Design a protein with these regions (language model features):
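Acidic, low-complexity intrinsically disordered regions
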Residues: 1-217
């Protein structure tokens, strides 16, 4: 295992209900990637955009070569095939890690899932299949963060095997999206710096997102 290598997998909702937040999502993502570049650590990035289709735009790219996300890649449309996006991402990473030499396998694997609505159009994976996959990967040290708007993110995360303390319900507005990416960026930076290969996530990663959400009530 290469304890200096981190695999980041971003699964970003671009379904039609994200309309109006395109520039915030693009800017937040680009800012987060810039932070990882500046950190200078060995990080590979996979980025998956989903609506009723699943589109892989970065396939384990070294973070230093990632070009800024633009409206050419991130544009809203369609429904929410969340389970298909997560299942595709897990199977892809699982297959890669399985076939790499032991000393090339990542010491840390972190999935970041964002959605602003409930699953409504997956065709290839069921909720139970995803739950089993995630629970199996968590036993091997993989981390999963789940950020959801317009839903009870904790409840929806638990349905697919992600603990409540790895989930947060965010406010689906410009500030809420901005805080999402900042919080995730900080959490990832701390994880990348950590020497641990298990339990390396900051337990308070979502505090600022939650505080903003509560303040909007």
């Amino acid at each position: 295992m290469n304890t200096e290598l981190t695999e980041l997998v971003f699964i970003l909702d671009r379904s039609g209900s994200m309309g109006g937040l395109e520039s915030d999502t693009i800017g937040g993502f680009n800012g987060m990637i810039a932070k990882q570049k500046a950190q200078g650590k060995k990080v590979n990035v996979t980025t998956i955009l989903f609506d009723d289709e699943v589109d892989i735009i970065h396939d384990r790219f070294p973070v230093e070569i990632i070009e800024p996300l633009t409206e050419k890649e991130y544009f809203v449309r369609g429904c929410t095939a969340l389970l298909d996006a997560v299942g595709t991402a897990i199977e892809k990473m699982e297959n890669v890690q399985k076939h790499l030499p032991e000393d090339h396998r990542a010491g840390k694997i972190i999935f970041v899932i964002t959605t602003d609505g409930l699953e409504n159009s997956s065709e290839h994976f069921t909720q139970e299949q995803i739950r089993r996959k995630i629970e199996a990967k968590k036993e091997r040290g993989w981390e999963f963060l789940f950020l959801g708007a317009n839903i009870d993110a904790g409840r929806e995360a638990e349905k697919i095997g992600i603990a409540r303390n790895r989930s947060v319900t965010y406010e689906n507005d410009s500030k809420g999206v901005e805080l999402n990416f900042k919080a995730v960026g900080r959490a990832i930076s701390k994880a990348v710096e950590s020497d641990a290969v298990m339990d390396f996530m900051d337990e308070h990663w979502a505090d600022e997102i939650q505080a903003y959400k509560e303040g909007k009530k």
